[in-house]
Amino acid sequence: MSLDLRARVREELERLKREGLYISPKVLEAPQEPVTRVEGREVVNLASNNYLGFANHPYLKEKARQYLEKWGAGSGAVRTIAGTFTYHVELEEALARFKGTESALVLQSGFTANQGVLGALLKEGDVVFSDELNHASIIDGLRLTKATRLVFRHADVAHLEELLKAHDTDGLKLIVTDGVFSMDGDIAPLDKIVPLAKKYKAVVYVDDAHGSGVLGEKGKGTVHHFGFHQDPDVVQVATLSKAWAGIGGYAAGARELKDLLINKARPFLFSTSHPPAVVGALLGALELIEKEPERVERLWENTRYFKRELARLGYDTLGSQTPITPVLFGEAPLAFEASRLLLEEGVFAVGIGFPTVPRGKARIRNIVTAAHTKEMLDKALEAYEKVGKRLGIIR
């Protein structure tokens, strides 16, 4: 690294530290479980996206081992050259069945799935209407297109309609929203958005990263939760790294959509395909949720209990509707201090501040899973009570 570049990088790092934005990730010293190990201590884990408890499940590990032994360590190529194997087709067929759509296409990253699908769908002359709290992958994906980009106030259907009225086009009108919003835990009002899209001849695009495996029958997602899963004008994109405990993303919808993405989605075209072990584990997760749908109900039982008890303690959880349960602290230093104190009490829950969330809205984001026991949640709640009183957040 040249001296000038080194100085530039150091200057930027110092700025991040001054502004309280510097990140130093915690290192987990045990598997991704509801109880794990951080900094040498056993902790209740409220920081992961392991919604259904699949990350270290014996069945998924066995499926991964089987596919590793049968198919080897890697795929060796991009999908369009020599990197599409029968196990990739098997996974896509399983995802389409699960989502209730004509087809599904697996992409190599959840983040770049949005870039790939949006880039393939949109061109100059199209207009996009995007919720202001959409995920960074949507924001970055839209920046790479030539479509006109308009932002509507969060979950504000009246504002969305104003924009639809004012911006007609002969091209595609695409309404883009998260299914479940990752910082607040609220659900997109698809029951209002989809009818509005029909009225103005628009297509709806849902990033269901935090809804898949959580909402709907057997965790089939936000779109299924609202009953729009067979609508050809609703495009679903989701990740394979959260509830399904793997890596990657996928798009589900009409067969023609899959064919278009195979030909035009750049992350699909230029990234090596999933290795066999990952696909084996993902297939195992989809098999398990069919056999054990009670996991989703257990997730919701735990979620309801944890939210109710936090409210009883006097915490503001920002009206969250899902297992994503933010606890509001306001200023980032306070949230980070609370996170540090919780860790001392044996609870791993991470503070989040600006720019991930607005200034004055710093919080600790908790995610309850199906694998947590009541005893684990009670330990976390006791820690929250102790820390909250120490910091003067609750009485």
UniProtKB/Swiss-Prot annotation:
What does UniProt report on the pH dependence of this protein? Optimum pH is 6.0. Stable at pH 4.5-5.0, and a loss of less than 10% of the initial activity is observed after 1 hour of incubation at these pH.
Q: Which GO terms describe its molecular function?
A: 8-amino-7-oxononanoate synthase activity; glycine C-acetyltransferase activity; pyridoxal phosphate binding
Q: Its Gene Ontology biological processes?
A: biotin biosynthetic process
Alphabetical list of Pfam families matching this protein: Aminotran_1_2
Show which residues constitute the signal peptide: none
Q: Which cofactor does it need?
A: pyridoxal 5'-phosphate
> Which residues of the sequence carry a binding annotation for substrate?
H135, T356
What is this enzyme's EC? 2.3.1.29, 2.3.1.47
- Catalysed reactions, as listed in the record: 6-carboxyhexanoyl-[ACP] + L-alanine + H(+) = (8S)-8-amino-7-oxononanoate + holo-[ACP] + CO2; glycine + acetyl-CoA = (2S)-2-amino-3-oxobutanoate + CoA
Q: Which UniProt keywords apply?
A: Acyltransferase, Biotin biosynthesis, Pyridoxal phosphate, Transferase
Does the UniProt entry include the keyword Transferase? Answer: yes
Q: Which Gene3D superfamilies match?
A: Aspartate Aminotransferase, domain 1 (3.90.1150.10), Type I PLP-dependent aspartate aminotransferase-like (Major domain) (3.40.640.10)
Q: Where does pyridoxal 5'-phosphate bind?
A: G110, F111, S182, D207, D208, A209, H210, T239, L240, S241, K242
- List the disulfide bonds in this chain: none
What InterPro entries does this protein map onto? Aminotrans_II_pyridoxalP_BS, Aminotransferase_I/II_large, AON_synthase_class-II, AONS_Archaea/Firmicutes, AONS_Archaea/Proteobacteria, PyrdxlP-dep_Trfase, PyrdxlP-dep_Trfase_major, PyrdxlP-dep_Trfase_small
Give the sites modified to N6-(pyridoxal phosphate)lysine: K242
Q: How does it assemble?
A: Homodimer.
Q: What does this protein do?
A: Catalyzes the decarboxylative condensation of pimeloyl-[acyl-carrier protein] and L-alanine to produce 8-amino-7-oxononanoate (AON), [acyl-carrier protein], and carbon dioxide. Can also use pimeloyl-CoA instead of pimeloyl-ACP as substrate. It also converts 2-amino-3-ketobutyrate and CoA to glycine and acetyl-CoA. Activity is also observed with the following combinations of substrates: acetyl-CoA and either L-alanine or L-serine, pimeloyl-CoA and either glycine or L-serine, and palmitoyl-CoA with L-alanine.
Protein family according to the UniProt entry: Belongs to the class-II pyridoxal-phosphate-dependent aminotransferase family.
What is the protein's name according to its record?
A: 8-amino-7-oxononanoate synthase/2-amino-3-ketobutyrate coenzyme A ligase
Q: Which organism is it from?
A: Thermus thermophilus (strain ATCC 27634 / DSM 579 / HB8)
User: What does UniProt list as this organism's lineage?
Assistant: Bacteria, Thermotogati, Deinococcota, Deinococci, Thermales
